[in-house]
Amino acid sequence: MFEQLNQPGLFGITNSNRDFTKKEAWGKNQFNNAFPIALACFMFSQNIKPIYIRLEKRNIEHNYFAVDQVFQINPLEAQAFFAFEHSYHPYTELIIGKTPAIDVVISNLQNSQIINAFEIKLTAIPDNTTANLPDNLQGCEIVIRPDTIVYLALSIAKVFQQNPLALLDILDPVCARIGDWEDATSIQPMIPLFCELLYTIFDRYQAVQIPILLQPIWKTQGKLSILHENCLDLFVWSNFALAKVFLDASIKPSEKSITRPERTTVWLIKMLYDFAQNGKIDYKRTLDRITFNLKNDKAFAASGMVTRKYMNSPELQNPRIKRHSIKHIIINGGQRYLSPERRLDSAIVSTPGLFEEIL
């Protein structure tokens, strides 16, 4: 549509709750979750499949997974609708209170069916911890917010919606021993047991793990704000694989205070245990009360030194989308709406010749 009308836009995002012909649709948060969807649509048009990170017998496994399989709809069809920063209503019946917003909810306009929802993390490679290392050792930092863990819990609870007792049978032998979930002293020794409980769930229900997080990467020339020639690619995390990141950081508890990954493990167990007992998740109560004196601005963060072992692949070292393709993703002058003070925007604006036509 944008191509036909010669108006600013993003590739493939024809129907959405944003108007990309207007500058206000290109703000910081808007660009960070809309550009990745346009990237996914462009990759689909080029028959380039994202890397799907999933769990296989407690180990990370990579597969190639087409965008229409991830989204469960052809993203370029007229009926595909993208609602950004929206609640995912299929989880409403599993939760007490309002379902938190997620980065994108995908629906089918033809039958009004809500199809899927994803968190999105647009990440730069290399990050500060790996910028001085060779390409094969570089990685990108990922920061996970608490609401992502809520959606992770809901995605697992949904599996047990018709049979919550199956979940209770797994969790109750350990969780019933907890007298005070807010007491760090009594909770900390239990965290390795919580990790094992979650792995038990993942082992038994491995076949039903689902994509939950889209992680586009954009590569720069070292620490410079100039895009690498091979600059863009897309990784998709399953809910179980994402959980493994904080479980790996929790399975050997810290000797001092509870860490963010450990608290995230406790959050997930508590929400699932509440669901197993009551059929509902009171996520606000869990997040607000189980703090262990840590701020709630994020669930946890993992540096490039950590994430590379989960993401290590030819695509991480050499992303498949060339930088000259960006002019086919940001179209009809949309780059003029970008804010150069932000890092990806700055790299796009600062990279010479990016939007010039190749003769």
Swiss-Prot record:
One of its GO terms (biological process) is DNA restriction-modification system. It catalyses: Endonucleolytic cleavage of DNA to give specific double-stranded fragments with terminal 5'-phosphates. Keywords: Endonuclease, Hydrolase, Nuclease, Restriction system. It is an enzyme of class 3 (hydrolase). One of its GO terms (molecular function) is type II site-specific deoxyribonuclease activity. Its EC number is 3.1.21.4. InterPro entries: Restrct_endonuc_II_HindVP. This is Type II restriction enzyme HgiDI. It comes from Herpetosiphon aurantiacus (Herpetosiphon giganteus). The gene is hgiDIR.
